[in-house]
From Swiss-Prot:
Cross-referenced SUPFAM superfamilies: Glyceraldehyde-3-phosphate dehydrogenase-like, C-terminal domain, NAD(P)-binding Rossmann-fold domains
HAMAP family: ArgC_type1 (MF_00150)
GO molecular function, one term: NADP+ binding
Pathway named in the protein's UniProt entry: Amino-acid biosynthesis; L-arginine biosynthesis; N(2)-acetyl-L-ornithine from L-glutamate: step 3/4
InterPro entries per the UniProt record, alphabetical: AGPR_AS, AGPR_type-1, NAD(P)-bd_dom_sf, NAGSA_dehydrogenase, Semialdehyde_DH_NAD-bd
Transmembrane segment boundaries: none
Primary gene name: argC
Protein name: N-acetyl-gamma-glutamyl-phosphate reductase
Keywords from the named record: Amino-acid biosynthesis, Arginine biosynthesis, Cytoplasm, NADP, Oxidoreductase
Source organism of the structure: Shigella flexneri
GO biological process, one term: L-arginine biosynthetic process
Amino acid sequence: MLNTLIVGASGYAGAELVTYVNRHPHMNITALTVSAQSNDAGKLISDLHPQLKGIVELPLQPMSDISEFSPGVDVVFLATAHEVSHDLAPQFLEAGCVVFDLSGAFRVNDATFYEKYYGFTHQYPELLEQAAYGLAEWCGNKLKEANLIAVPGCYPTAAQLALKPLIDADLLDLNQWPVINATSGVSGAGRKAAISNSFCEVSLQPYGVFTHRHQPEIATHLGADVIFTPHLGNFPRGILETITCRLKSGVTQAQVAQALQQAYAHKPLVRLYDKGVPALKNVVGLPFCDIGFAVQGEHLIIVATEDNLLKGAAAQAVQCANIRFGYAETQSLI
C-alpha cells in the first residue's frame, strides 16, 4: 500500500485526486494539505466539495513544514501553484517521496522558459533534467524509473495526443504550422474568485493570444512549431480543441486513421472516432481523451476533447502513478 499525500487538495483538481486516490486499492491517503495561510485550513474536504460527503471526510491540514507530513509517505501529488511546486518538490524528493506535480514547474527542460513564461527564476536545473514528462501514452518507459513526474498541462495533453502520431508518422507538411484553436471551461482558472470568471461576466473569448505558456510546452514536446490560441468557454469544465493541419502530398485519410490506430490501439484512455468528431459532453466527468478527424484533399481537421480536470490533470496524474508503480494503467480511473 502506497502512503499518499495530496498537497493543494482544496482546489478542483485536488478534489478529483482525492476521489481517485481514495478508491485506489493500492493507495492510502495519509493527509490532505493546504497552505498555512489558506482560509480552507481546518475545513473538511467534503465541506468544500460536497460530492465527497460520506466518501472522504478528512480535514484540510495547514502545511508550513513538509517534515510534519513527509515521514512514511511514498507518493506526493502536488496540486499547487507553479512557484509552490518549484519549492516543495525538491524537499519531498529529498525526503524519499515520488512526486507527481500537476503544475508547470518542471515540464520543460529549459530554465529560461520559466523566466519568460512563468515569471520566476528556476533554481533547480538539475531537476528539470531529471523530471519525466507525464504524457502517459507516450512517455511510459521514462515514467517507470522517475521520481519526479511533471504532469502535462490540460491544453498540451489534448494537442499532443492528437498531433504526435501524425508527426511521428511523417504525415504532416510542417511548413504550414498546425493551428490549434482550443476552448476550456472556467474551472481551468481554478476556484479563486475573479470578476472575469463570474456567472454574469464570463463569455466565450480568446486569451493569451501568441503569449500563452502552453504554446511553447506543446511545441517543445512535439518537436514542431504550432499556432495555439486558447479560449475561455462559458461552461464549467472540459476542453475541445480543433486543430487544422496540412497533409503531405499524397497522404490519404486511411493513412491518418492508421497512424492514430497504431498509436492508441492499446491505450485505453484515448478513444478514437471512426466516424464524425467528438463532443465535449461525452468526456466531462471521465478520464478519456476522444479524438476524431476529417480530411479534404491535403487539409486535415482533427478534434480532441477531454475533461480539463481529469485527463488534463488529476486522471493523468494517477495514470502516471499507475505506470510508475506497475499497476493497471486505468486502476481507479474507470
